[in-house]
């Protein structure tokens, strides 16, 4: 008798973001995952394939307009692909429901509220979860990520710098007081809307 595999129920919050499309593509290839919820701030009835035509006939699932007081509580994990400040409104709702969260915004990348507020020039409204977040760089924090309820996905600039520098620093080849990083980004580096 074959045993049925239990699928991990996944939600994507901010489903119309470009990063969400990439998450969907990865998850669709995973045999143990079921995409159960696609939440968006957009109004109206539409499917994810209406926003991303490449998903037509692959994932024609409807998107749900997110209401903070009426979010699904039956998920195993949620990917939050919302802009900074907005993400921190949703993350604690899922954590309080016992749902693991991978936050793709910058809202949980710093463990100190004062550091976040200095660099992002805005108040952090969920400081109690800052020190619970694990920096989501598996090359360095793989074991912590496995156990984390909240993973703060690192940004592109820090990732490019850390991946190259970490082995050099840990082996004593580079001193941290004289590092200069010069990085550039294309127009799509800041999301769907031009900035």
Q: Model-predicted segments: where are they?
A:
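Short, Lys/Arg-enriched N-terminal segments with co-localized hydrophobic residues
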Residues: 1-7
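N-terminal Rossmann-like NAD(P) cofactor-binding subdomain of oxidoreductases
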Residues: 7-195
